[in-house]
Design a protein with these regions (language model features):
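Acidic, surface-exposed loops and disordered segments
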Residues: 1-98
Length: 98
């Protein structure tokens, strides 16, 4: 259960990083209907889909940016169609004890 989710996350990130090195886009989805995924892909009931990966050639321009002063991590598109993806800085996410 919990370890399966951790392993799935590690595998998904590895696939995403490998895709990036080959100029492919990859998006990890956690919001999906597991019953529909089982039905469409023929996955047996004893297996639980934990995430979905979309993988392919990118059609959009995406910019990963530092979160603004308002603290919002909501994605948005500008007038030119650029997909802005605000992320917290690494320093805010790591706990380093000295």
């Amino acid at each position: 259960a919990k370890l399966n989710a951790i392993d799935a996350g590690i595998a998904a990130q590895t696939i995403q990083l490998a895709a990036y090195t080959r100029d492919l886009g990859c998006c990890i989805f956690l919001s999906f209907d597991p019953r529909k995924i089982r039905e469409v892909l023929g996955i047996p009931e004893n297996l639980e889909p934990l995430l979905v990966l979309a993988l392919g050639f990118q059609k959009e321009v995406r910019r990963v940016e530092t979160v603004g002063a308002d603290g919002s991590v909501k994605y948005w598109r500008d007038a030119q169609g650029v997909h802005h993806v605000p992320k917290r800085p690494l320093e805010d996410l790591l706990i380093i004890k000295k």
